[in-house]
Amino acid sequence: MLHIADTILTSRLLTGTGKFATPELMLAALEASGSQLVTMAMKRVDLNGGNDAILAPLRQLGIKLLPNTSGAKTADEAVFAARLAREALGTHWLKLEIHPDVKYLLPDPIETLKAAEQLVKEGFTVLPYCGADPVLCKRLEEVGCAAVMPLGAPIGSNQGLQTRDFLRIIIEQARIPVIVDAGIGAPSHAADALEMGADGVLVNTAIAVARDPVAMARAFRLAVNAGGLARQAGQGNKQFVASATSPLTGFLHQQTEGAER
């Protein structure tokens, strides 16, 4: 179970709507993923309330929408986009994204914290995309964010958990859910994040650009379930020396003694 604010989700896998070849393929992949919370950029939404090829089918699947402020370069732009999303979609949930750097899409920590504080005051349930900075994540928690979404690697890079050491600190210190966002390129990366103690992961590119997005979505679903179950089960401690699972010393001595007789 993933508990965010006043909502309990049975899936720890969050997904996105970008980069899919067709809306139909996107919907099939999202359904296969089992995800219950899907993020989407406001620029993809039909603000006139007409027949939206993406929005309406998502709602029919019972998926909770998480609009994001992708494209915002400042706190003011993000707050404006958030208000627009709440008006257009009727939700106070928001994935806060502010990345002025168009090459690496790295989040602006100063503007993100500023916007988060304002949006929380306005009643939004804020899930900020941020760098894997333990101090920043703690500050975002303190201003009232419902979860933090530190990056594993740059958006869409498929590099996996390049920020592993910092993610461990964030997870250890957090009193709100930690959802690893960006850079997860394989189901094994997702399982690794859950085994580490992350509460969830958000995956988009790795599913959308796969040769078979539906199969990849299913693979991520299984990986997230496996990683979460492994964490709950409790993994054995690492050690630098061997530890035999089936000691044979006594058996060999018995055989030797029998032969001597």
Curated annotation (Swiss-Prot):
One of its GO terms (molecular function) is thiazole synthase activity. GO terms for cellular component: cytoplasm. Gene3D superfamilies: Aldolase class I (3.20.20.70). Its main location: cytoplasm. Pathway: Cofactor biosynthesis; thiamine diphosphate biosynthesis. The active site is at 95 (schiff-base intermediate with dxp). It comes from the Bacteria. It holds the Pfam family ThiG. 1-deoxy-D-xylulose 5-phosphate binds at residues 156, 182-183, 204-205. It is found in: Cytoplasm. It catalyses: [ThiS sulfur-carrier protein]-C-terminal-Gly-aminoethanethioate + 2-iminoacetate + 1-deoxy-D-xylulose 5-phosphate = [ThiS sulfur-carrier protein]-C-terminal Gly-Gly + 2-[(2R,5Z)-2-carboxy-4-methylthiazol-5(2H)-ylidene]ethyl phosphate + 2 H2O + H(+). Keywords: Cytoplasm, Schiff base, Thiamine biosynthesis, Transferase. InterPro entries: Aldolase_TIM, Thiazole_synthase_ThiG, ThiG. Its EC number is 2.8.1.10. One of its GO terms (biological process) is thiamine diphosphate biosynthetic process. Belongs to the ThiG family. Homotetramer. Forms heterodimers with either ThiH or ThiS. Catalyzes the rearrangement of 1-deoxy-D-xylulose 5-phosphate (DXP) to produce the thiazole phosphate moiety of thiamine. Sulfur is provided by the thiocarboxylate moiety of the carrier protein ThiS. In vitro, sulfur can be provided by H(2)S. This is Thiazole synthase. It comes from Pectobacterium atrosepticum (strain SCRI 1043 / ATCC BAA-672). The gene is thiG.
